[in-house]
Amino acid sequence: MARLDYDALNATLRYLMFSVFSVSPGALGDQRDAIIDDASTFFKQQEERGVVVRGLYDVAGLRADADFMVWTHAERVEALQATYADFRRTTTLGRACTPVWSGVGLHRPAEFNKSHIPAFLAGEEPGAYICVYPFVRSYEWYLLPDEERRRMLAEHGMAARGYKDVRANTVPAFALGDYEWILAFEAPELDRIVDLMRELRATDARRHTRAETPFFTGPRVPVEQLVHSLP
């Protein structure tokens, strides 16, 4: 991979939206080819408004209340809102969906390590599996001395050193919803995310996590596979 221009990437404003939906059983009927064509065309057209569809993810069964998740990102949050609204209003798939959860984050430079760039922004290919969750730090976290927070974050990073195949996308979400951060882990295999998450529990920074649910996890799937799998 070419050397990254960290200054340019950290100067980039990029909003991310993770939107989770459920579908009522039978709402899509049995004949789904037209639904697939409609949804495929819609997602491809989003590039014209500057929206990148990073992936569609099957979260069915990993949660009882949701069937799939869509990850989009763009320079302007209004573009993401338009994609979200148009999907629900203009596509057969979207009209059959009920929103379960949606969260927005914005890339900003990491506080202590400016080379910590989200995988999607660094130009990395999407992972085969994803785990997305929001989190909120303790009230004390932001009042701690910089060196103490730096130490804990460095320890947190060291705990992940054996999982270089698990790529992190950590973005602030202050004022964009009910959370302070949104994190999306991407990996070639799901067990790698599971093992990493367990490792990260044994770090001091864990003491300063006040909330970190809900979790949305599953494989990245093409539109055709997703639509055929829906109830």
Swiss-Prot record:
InterPro entries (UniProt xref): ChdC/CLD, Dimeric_a/b-barrel
Cross-referenced Pfam families: Chlor_dismutase
Identify the pathway.
Porphyrin-containing compound metabolism; protoheme biosynthesis
Q: Which GO terms describe its molecular function?
A: heme binding; metal ion binding; oxidoreductase activity, acting on the CH-CH group of donors, oxygen as acceptor
Task: Give the E.C. number(s).
Answer: 1.3.98.5
Signal peptide limits: none
The top EC class, named as a word, is oxidoreductase
Q: Which reaction does it catalyse?
A: Fe-coproporphyrin III + 2 H2O2 + 2 H(+) = heme b + 2 CO2 + 4 H2O; Fe-coproporphyrin III + H2O2 + H(+) = harderoheme III + CO2 + 2 H2O; harderoheme III + H2O2 + H(+) = heme b + CO2 + 2 H2O
Mind telling me which GO cellular component terms the entry cites?
plasma membrane
Cofactor names from the entry are: Fe-coproporphyrin III
What does this gene product do?
A: Involved in coproporphyrin-dependent heme b biosynthesis. Catalyzes the decarboxylation of Fe-coproporphyrin III (coproheme) to heme b (protoheme IX), the last step of the pathway. The reaction occurs in a stepwise manner with a three-propionate intermediate.
**Name assigned to this protein:** Coproheme decarboxylase
Gene expressing this chain: chdC
